[in-house]
Amino acid sequence: MRTWRIKHLNLAALTAYELIKEENLTDIHAKGYLLRHKKSGAKISLISNDDENKVFYIGFRTPVEDSTGVPHIIEHTVLCGSDKFPVKDPFVELVKGSLNTFLNAMTYPDKTVYPVASCNDKDFANLMDVYLDAVFHPNIYKKEEIFKQEGWHYELEDKDAPVTINGVVYNEMKGAFSSPEGVLDRVVLNSLFPDTTYSNESGGDPEVIPELTYEQYLDFHRKFYHPCNSYIYLYGNMDMDEKLEFLDKEYLSHYDKIEVDSVIQLQAPFTKPVTISKPYSIASSESLEDNAYLSYNVAIGTNLESELTLAFDVLDYALLSAPGAPLKQALIDAGIGKDIMGGFDNSTLQPIFSVVAKNANKEDEEKFVGIIEDTLKKIVKDGLNRKSLLAGINSEEFKFREADYGNFPKGLIYGLSCMDSWLYDDDEPFLYLKILDVFTALKQKIETGYFEELIQKYLLDNSHKSYVSIEPEKGLNAKLEKELEEKLAAYKKSLSEEEIDKLVEDTKHLKQYQEEPSPKEDLMKIPMLKRQDMKREAQPLVYEKVSCNGIETIHTNIYSNGIHYLNLMFDISDITEEELPYLGVLKAVLGYMDTEHYNYADLANEINLMTGGISSQINIYADTKKKDSFHAKYEVRSKILYQNLEEGLRLLSEILMRTQITDEKRLYEILARIKSRLQMSLSSAGHSVSAMRAMSYFSPVARFNDLVGGIALYRTIAELEEHFDEKKQFLMDKLRSLAEKIFVKNRLLISLTADTEGYQLLEEKFPQFLTVLPDGEKEGEAVAFQCEKKNEGFLDASKVQYVSRAGNYLSAGYSYTGALRILKVILSYDYLWINVRVKGGAYGCMSGFMRNGDAYFTSYRDPNLKSTNEIYEGIPAYLRAFDADERDMTKYIIGTVSDMDTPLNPAAKGMRSVSAYLTNISYEELQRERNEVLDAQPENIKNLAGLIEAVLAQDALCVIGAEENVEAEKDMFLEVKNLY
């Protein structure tokens, strides 16, 4: 058992603050304090524990009165220089030159939050200082160019050219408004709260953003960015007294308390539901039929009622999210929508419960509402499935106790959950960190009719509802673009010759401003660590290769809080290209169809009662020593408490060996759902999808990934769904034969993350699992993939592009070195950032260099296409002229080390172990790479120009983007085709 060290505040010495409350936050092994700064009125919550991954944020309540996106533009622009740190982009300087474990800023419908995290004390203090100066003393009052660059501006490079609009936030929101799910979410929020801040789009509506003036934008900052409207949060193992003294002396003591009217207002309940319908744009190739979204939305109490909120998280599972959940099943059985989504969202003062039917038809709206309400009435009368409720509670409780938030520091997630109550009650930051007792209470209420009463009161008898539909319209984006062109042409026509000349001059001036680097003396003001502050040792690989009951096992022997992270990895390296997409289907089938002993709904409940989740993944591990050699694995991952291991293994064998792939109706439902979810991911992650596709033209690894999770998988799924009746028998036979071939002892590798006790338990309990697993045949020779350069342009109903270029440097005779890790930082946050984002207006730009030689450059929500590709082609010249001084090199090195040293939770440490084993990389090689990073000189970067030239010479290009923009540049592609 671990002991938790907590440093107590010296409150007597902190005379600038008054203590509002202190609490033992035993659920998260911490002590919580709520303070108020006496002079400024700032609110501060502290969570003190022994977590070295320290977190700070400052947030502001930022309600809006229109959809110009002013809080979003401020979020971008305050990080573009300040009094103490006048460089043009301190945010990027920190990304490149700090050991941050998190660094970002986020705009919500009612708040704006600026969080940072770091494990290094000195670095953490630097990050705090830069962020505090940014929000309180930004350069936005001195330089209107910042507003124009990040928000919006008219652009006219030549007096005879048409006027256009550009700006990072403007283009980001054009991308956001291209997604039907994004459109629906906005309309739902607006529909339920028409008299509050939520009736507007805080991120900005692209049609409205250009109405925002520079003065209105500054007024918003003046009004809301005052300490008395702020929420300051500190978390982790640090000297809290020192941080509070710093806050007071450097910032808060300079302000006097004022009144800021920012209270988030409650929406008065409706007397009857409202019905709203809006259009969304689809590509000309897409069908109008089965393409509407229908939604049923209800406002549920307030976020200050933690038991109600957690009860609705459980109801979300029991009614809607779980496989076979009654609301979802009733709609699917009635043929309304092919994918049922929705759920419970408590990110606003009044949370929302939604049921959404995707791939539906507008004429079914009345039937949709009727089925939901009839089903709910029946549930209230007959009672909910008790096991579903208990499984829902167990699932939420497991997640809270485990506190595994992937790459996000848990202190950040705790801090954001503080805001779920604190923003609406200044005295209540810790409400959602004290919930284990609530879970206990909810378990006790399962048999009392409590959950059925909630359904009656909040879903059936509650008239605060909206029925929102969004309907497909072909060419809507093109129509809106044409209207904008006409509006801009009329605007230009209204200008005098002098005004046109001034606009050309302003455009030129902004470009000059963007191209001018920050003065050296300003850059020197950004605090930075030194090379010698970097730890020289690479993170150790803490695994051992052992035999568990005769099965090769990679055991990562670390403390895991009594949880087995068990990964059963079956080799699929010999599965053919034709068969691989069917593994993508199998992944969605296992655990979601009936088995010998359970129907699929009961199986889901059993999984959530006995484990922290069981899921399938398909991964490929490229061998770092042999080109085009790899290990492909079908992975069944589980999280099982030590005391539940026997039950967990029983469920794993039930899923792998006893799934009955015979239910045609259920199989079709699963196919339709995969198709729907893939559509969403192809659109929302267009940058990574297009990069993967570009690499698939030459890379076996990327070709594999595309077949099991990219555009190639989508095409197979769409074909199967469309011709299901004639293909269903073939599909069921194929899935069964693949399962029989793969799930055998001779293909199995185990990855276990747990301590010695956990390993011994597995050794003891695993023989029973092995008795049902046939020996089978060992995998055959790995498949040789047929890669073919296609250079595709995919047409989408988007307003922006995702532009990807790729190649392989190993095939051109170059090798992987630590310098490539630094190059990724330099390109992503210098060359590409300045050219693609700052000047080009794209929301994002990235690059990547894999050990197997695959390399890519990609853009995200990019208004451009051809010019972005030309920017990629300029990289070699940029590198040949690269001449960083020692400070700049150190900065790039720190940013690289920051990425290499991201703190890992137990599950991630286990994945790192097995990945190193399968990719054939040793600790010595990791150490050599780290040395190459820490000792890098400018010459090492300059020398990469030839490597990049070789990558670009392979000319692998893939773009996903707006129909008219891709068509306009069709000569760049070998093929232009519809994405869907």
What would you call each of these model-derived segments?
Residues 218-250, 731-766:
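Non-catalytic, conformational "gating/processing" segments within enzyme and secreted inhibitor domains
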